[in-house]
């Protein structure tokens, strides 16, 4: 049995709080990401991992030492580090002659690899190469995806879902306008993914809504997809299962549309409109001339009948 799989009994209150923090919960903790260097990572891959760690702070763990492992051949090392650091997301960087400037991005389910996708770095511009102001640590980004490949191809559809999981940050109920500080833009075109990062500038516009400008902040990457390791449909569905306690209770005759608008259905008996009392207005009263015409019409009808 692995040392991390043993049932541990806390000896101090601090250890008890630490173990309680890792226990299964209805509302899970914020997903942390671990960034790992391979045994032969070069300067480009190392800088990419540093920049990604800067975007993920404080929800990331950067391993500075090199780790000789191959995620697609042996996943035990990744699973060990996942348990040790309590991280469900990972990014692994390596470099060799066959696959230069290589990145593997993936996620865990129950401390086992759920899916991972290998990406090759064709072009890279670092955070420090772009001399502009940066966003503060822990800022929640806005994610934009452009390109039909993200909705057509299964590999790119999974990659989109994985990138959202990796960069979305904590779940919040609302965000103030000044809190929207930077954008991560992903474009899928001709089998490649273009990753860009922009800082959001709110300018005066003369009205209540400010004028928005984008300023490139970095990092910037041109990526090409290589190998994939995707979970089966059953396992993927199991990983997305929502506990019964968190599911909204069904209320009779009440439904919601895709935008969250609540609709209610009311069952009523058929109403007799003949007995409906309407508001009497002066403008609707008959005039004396009209009454005279009506009286003459009634008299003529009586004469004809006689």
From Swiss-Prot:
Brix domain location: 31-234
Region (Disordered): 270-306
Matching Pfam families: Brix
UniProtKB keywords: Nucleus, Ribosome biogenesis
Stated name of the protein: Ribosome production factor 2 homolog
Subcellular location(s) of the protein: Nucleus, Nucleolus
Residue stretches of biased makeup (Basic residues): 277-286
Entries under InterPro entries matching the protein: Brix (IPR007109), Rpf2 (IPR039770)
GO terms, biological process: maturation of LSU-rRNA; protein localization to nucleolus; regulation of signal transduction by p53 class mediator; ribosomal large subunit assembly; ribosomal large subunit biogenesis
């Amino acid at each position: 049995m692995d040392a991390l799989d043993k049932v541990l009994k806390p000896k101090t209150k601090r250890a008890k709080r630490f173990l309680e923090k890792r226990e299964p919960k209805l509302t899970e903790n914020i997903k942390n990401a671990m960034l790992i260097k391979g045994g032969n990572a070069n300067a480009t891959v190392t800088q990419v991992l540093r920049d990604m760690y800067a975007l993920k702070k404080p929800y990331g763990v950067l391993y500075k030492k090199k780790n000789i492992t191959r995620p697609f051949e042996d996943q035990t090392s990744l699973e060990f580090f996942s348990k040790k650091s309590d991280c469900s997301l990972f990014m692994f960087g390596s470099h060799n002659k066959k696959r230069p400037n290589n990145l593997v991005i993936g996620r865990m389910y129950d401390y086992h690899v759920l899916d991972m996708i290998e990406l090759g770095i064709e072009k890279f511009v670092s955070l420090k190469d772009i001399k502009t102001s940066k966003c503060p640590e822990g800022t929640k980004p806005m994610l934009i995806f452009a390109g039909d490949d993200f909705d057509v191809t299964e590999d790119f559809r999974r990659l989109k879902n994985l990138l959202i999981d990796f960069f979305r940050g904590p779940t919040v109920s609302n965000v103030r306008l000044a809190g929207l500080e930077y954008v991560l833009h992903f474009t899928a075109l001709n089998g490649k993914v273009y990753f860009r990062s922009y800082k959001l500038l709110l300018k005066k516009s003369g009205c209540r809504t400010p004028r928005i400008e984008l300023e490139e902040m970095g990092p910037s990457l041109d990526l090409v997809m290589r190998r994939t390791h995707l979970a089966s449909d059953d396992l993927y569905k199991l990983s997305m299962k929502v506990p019964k306690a968190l599911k909204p209770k069904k209320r009779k005759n009440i439904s919601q549309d895709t935008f969250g608008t609540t609709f209610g259905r009311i069952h009523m008996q058929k109403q007799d409109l003949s007995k409906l009392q309407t508001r009497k207005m002066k403008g609707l009263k008959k005039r004396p001339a009209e009454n005279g015409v009506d009286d003459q019409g009634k008299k003529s009808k009586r004469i004809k009948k006689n």
